[in-house]
Amino acid sequence: MYADGKLIYQLDAVPGIWGNTPGWTWNIVRFSSNVSSLQVQFTPCYPETAGQQKTFYIGGGYNIYRGVMRRAMPAFLISMMVILIGLYISIYWIVIRCGSRIDGTLLYLGIFSILLGTWSANETDVATLLLTNRQGCSYLAFATLMLLPMSCILFVKSFLEIRDDWFCRIICNANLALIVLTHILNATEIYEFRRSLWMTHALIILMILYLLVVICSKIARRQLDQ
């Protein structure tokens, strides 16, 4: 950022284990009210991030901070509730599992809730403002998103008593292979997490299509409880 042609702020992408990115972060820059012109220059870390919309706030730092936190807090609290519900369900399954033989439906639901809540909470502005390790948070977002398809499909398969093991196993194995592959590509700096995100999205779409077909099939066969 330049104020009247003078450089006053700069944020560089530092290569690390999380990737060549500063992470999704807020940049707070203080400058004099006497400044007549400001120039902001962006250099995308990856081609995929070029052209993304940027939001600017001008005013007192405290008022901006309070306004952003107030708007983002409801979504953050809902995400935290989802995490707590997932933890409760998982612990409950572990406790009752010791005394009786039950399937893993509740455990899969608990894990899925924890992953979904963690991912959604990490995407809010509350997490962006409070958590300082933005590279680590960026990795957390990718990791939880990559784990979501497998946990979701295991829950639905167990809950609906889906007997199709073949295609379900293919999706789960593809999910595991994707996790290993993307971590190797990121570690070797061949293809970092941000650039391989489309693979995770493709797997999620495949999972959704599979679940829709299975649910519609069970409805058509009147095997789904009303």
What does each model-identified segment do?
Residues 73-226:
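Juxtamembrane segments at transmembrane-helix boundaries
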Residues 1-82:
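Membrane-proximal, cysteine-centered motifs at transmembrane boundaries in secretory-pathway
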